[in-house]
Amino acid sequence: MGEEAVYYITKGPIRGACQHKHRTIDYAYHCLRHDIRSAEKEGTRSDRRILAVDNGQVRELVEHEICELDYARRTAL
């Protein structure tokens, strides 16, 4: 079997993209939080956001994925 059709990345125009292929929005959100903390330690701000990669094409999150992201934000420790 091949790769999953959809995975998630964190990416920004200045800080660039993480090198991970997150299987879930929750994992991508934890990666984003890590980048935010790292940027703060460097005295800057993270410009990354979570994007979906669907069959090799980067796209914005759709409604059900935005709901998953909202849930991840509310339940993050």
For each feature predicted by the language model, list its residue ranges.
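A short, exposed loop/beta-hairpin motif centered on an aromatic-Gly-Thr core
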Residues: 14-30, 63
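Short, mixed-charge low-complexity intrinsically disordered segments
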Residues: 36-77
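Short linear motifs in intrinsically disordered
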Residues: 1, 28-43
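Extended, non-core accessory segments
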Residues: 4, 13, 34, 75-77
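Short aromatic-glycine-(Arg/Gly/Cys) micro-motifs in beta-strand/loop hairpins
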Residues: 1-18, 45-56
